[in-house]
Swiss-Prot record:
One GO term of the biological process aspect: ovulation
Family the entry assigns: Belongs to the glycoprotein hormones subunit beta family.
Record: glycosylation sites: 29, 46
Pfam families per record: Cys_knot
GO CC terms of this entry: cytoplasm; extracellular space
Endpoints of the signal sequence: 1-17
Originating gene: cgba
Entry protein name: Gonadotropin subunit beta-1
Family matches, as SUPFAM superfamilies: Cystine-knot cytokines
Molecular-function GO terms, alphabetical: follicle-stimulating hormone activity; follicle-stimulating hormone receptor binding
Length: 132
């Protein structure tokens, strides 16, 4: 009986150990749904982003003098790629540019280049999909 319990407890650890990211801040593949009313199209673009956990500590006492911040998993290096949306009439800009993460780091969220608000866990979607 003890052997069966041990295997049940070890299985989640093996699955966790086999994951590439292991919960640390790293690159991951994501899909972005892009919908254009002008072009009448909805496509899904595959790219990379940063995801995972960063070491942080919660202070027992927050001093008004000492700055308080927590590190989050952010892009370190990135580039942009541009695609042409299908179905656009003449005169409509069909280009869509999106970020592609090249590397990640644990750092303070830079509000000048990043939306540091809460992330929606609901998947984005539209009526028809095309994958690029």
């Amino acid at each position: 009986m003890m052997r069966g319990v041990t295997m049940v407890l070890l299985l989640p650890m093996l699955v966790w150990a086999g994951s590439e990211c292991k919960a640390r801040c790293c690159l991951t593949n994501i899909s972005i749904t892009v919908e254009s009313d002008e072009c009448g199209s909805c496509i899904t673009v595959n790219t990379t982003a940063c995801t995972g956990l960063c070491r942080t500590q919660e202070r027992a006492y927050r001093s008004p003098v000492a700055p308080y911040f927590q590190n989050t998993c952010n892009f370190r290096d990135w580039t942009y790629e541009t695609i042409q949306l299908p179905g656009c009439p003449l005169g409509v800009d069909s280009s869509f540019t999106y970020p592609v993460a090249l590397s990640c780091e644990c750092s303070q969220c830079n509000t000048e280049i990043t939306d540091c608000g809460a992330f929606s866990m609901q998947p984005s979607s539209c009526h028809t999909h095309a994958y690029y």
